[in-house]
Structures are given as structure tokens and as C-alpha cells.
Amino acid sequence: MSEATTGTGRVAYVLKGYPRLSEVFITSEIYRVERLGVPLRLYVIKAADEDVHHDVVRRVRTQPEYLLQPTSLTRARLPRWLAQNRGMFLPAVVRTGRRHPVGLARAAGQALAQSVRARRKFWAFPRKLYVLELLRAVDLADRLDRAGDVARLHAHFAHGTTTVTWLASTITGLPFSFTGHAKDIYTEELNPAGLLRRKMDAASFVVTCTEANRRHLASLGSRTPVHVLYHGLNADFEP
């Protein structure tokens, strides 16, 4: 039986970018979780793009693993983009399809349904963003399978990163949780057509940083527990 099955494996953090000066609070959290003896893996969606880092970064022992970096989809036509990037994703799709055929089919169905729900107008094309997030989830699932020691996933920020994590959880069967912070839980465009509620329903728990945020998340109607972990200054911090 694998470590992931027995629940004694690693926690995989899924982040949009790492390390980031604007998100030192996340790096500090990772450092503190390591200090508690929790084994981690770090999976990062976007390539590192900052040269200056906070000092806490060097204290984190777990090294980040960056997901595949496709070309921009923002202004590209989806068929052309898929043709340009299929060679990058195809090996992971094949491996994941062999290991998790049902999970991959379910995740593809979730992504397709969301792409249709999130159309800006009834007659508009489905939102292509969710194709990209599905492929990123397949890449993540493939890496989790190869690692073989992850027991659960945790994402920071409740929009794109959590969508990728939710889909990867659907594929692999690993439980996931996420932390919601600010605009990622309040801005409808970032989680259109009820997406945030669906991700909450699928998660084992949700974390946020203020009581106002907790009340807002609770108002969405999900029964998933929402925990508050306040930001603060640790006056006893030792370098």
C-alpha cells in the first residue's frame, strides 16, 4: 500500500508562482509547516520570474517543481494553441489516461461543463481557459503519480490554482484543500458560474485569513468547513 493511501505521505502545496515577494506570507507558512516536521512537495504553475527573494526562501528545504510552460493562450485560437503545445502535454495525457481513465474522464467533463457555464453570453464560445487548466491538472497528476508519496494537496488562492488542484484531485483521487485570500473569493469573474461553490463542495476543508472572509465563504452554501487562520507578526521569530 502506498504512502498516499495510508495517509502518511507528503502534503503537496500547489502555487501559481514561487517564490514571490508579494507572497512572503505563503513562503513563511511553508517554512513553519516544515519546521513542524510535515514532509512537503511544492508544485508551481508558472516559472520563477523574480530575481529578488525574501530571506525566508533560503530557509525552506523543499525545492519547487515547476509545471510545463506552454505558450500564452490569451490571444490564441484554441485549435492553433493545441497544435503548438500538444507535444508538450501528450506524454502526460497518455500516462495519466492509462493510470486514471475514469478520473481523467470525470475531470475533462468538469472542465468542459465549466467552460460552457462560464460563457460571457449564451451564444459565445466556451471559455478556453478551462482547457489550459485541465492540461495543467493532467501535468500535475502525472507528477504526483511519479512522486508516489503525496497524501493530500493544498492550493493557495481560490481561483486558477485551486481549479487546477481540484481537477488533479478528481483525476488522482487525492483529497485537496485550499486557502482563499481576497479578490480570489470575492470577484465573480475569477470563479464564474458558481465555480467557487463547486470547488468548496469538493474540498475537504477551506482556510481563510479573516472572519469576514469566513462569513462570505459560508454564505455560498457549502457544508465544507471553513477555518480562519489570522495573519500576524510573530514577535518571537528566530532567524
Predicted features and spans:
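Histidine-centered beta-alpha loop that forms part of the nucleotide-sugar donor binding/catalytic region
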Residues: 16, 45, 158, 180-183, ...
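A conserved, positively charged/aromatic
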Residues: 176-204
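Conserved N-terminal ligand/cofactor-binding loop architecture of enzyme catalytic domains
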Residues: 47-133
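Acidic anion/phosphate-binding donor-loop and adjacent secondary structure
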Residues: 73-76, 188-190, 218, 233-239
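A short beta-strand/loop micro-motif in the catalytic core of glycosyltransferases
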Residues: 201-211, 227
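N-terminal subdomain of nucleotide-sugar transferases
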Residues: 1-81, 145-148, 174, 201, ...
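Carbohydrate-associated surface elements
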Residues: 212, 232
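Short N-terminal targeting/anchoring amphipathic segment
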Residues: 81-82, 97, 103, 128-129, ...
